[in-house]
Design a protein with these regions (language model features):
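Conserved glycine-bearing catalytic or ligand-binding loops at nucleotide- and phosphate-handling centers
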Residues: 3
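Mg2+-dependent prenyl diphosphate-binding active-site environment of isoprenoid biosynthetic enzymes
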Residues: 12, 16-23, 27-121
Length: 121
């Protein structure tokens, strides 16, 4: 298998892990916060942090990937939280992240803050 193919396969797997641990809610307020958090996480990226965590787990003898999956997702959520908060008007006031509107531009500054906080928790 070519390196690019292997990398693409791993990214697909990591993206599925990240989506697996995103919460759901029927509550209207919570749903908007979750939607904003999902918008941020699903913007893409290299996913290098969870990939390194998975490979480190394997190199240390880990066999059951179910054990490391929540930590992989949490690591990416924490990274995304830092980006969401960094983009806020009180910080860098960025309009775009990864080629699309930032979370606070789509959902408002208040939900940008709440989405970032939710990703950290």
């Amino acid at each position: 298998m070519m390196f690019k193919d292997e990398l693409d396969n791993r990214l697909l797997y990591i993206n599925s892990v990240i989506k697996e641990f995103l919460p759901e809610s029927d509550n209207e307020l919570y749903k908007k916060i979750i939607d904003a958090a999902c918008y941020s996480v699903e913007a893409g990226g290299k996913r290098i942090r969870p990939m390194i965590m998975l490979e480190t787990y394997r190199l240390c003898g880990g066999k059951d990937e179910e054990i490391v999956k929540p930590f992989m997702a949490a690591l990416e959520y924490i990274h995304t939280y830092s980006l969401v908060h960094d983009d806020l008007p009180a910080m860098d006031n960025d309009d775009y992240r990864r080629g699309r509107l930032t979370t606070h531009k789509v959902f408002g500054e208040d939900f940008g803050i709440l989405a970032g906080d939710a990703l950290l928790n």
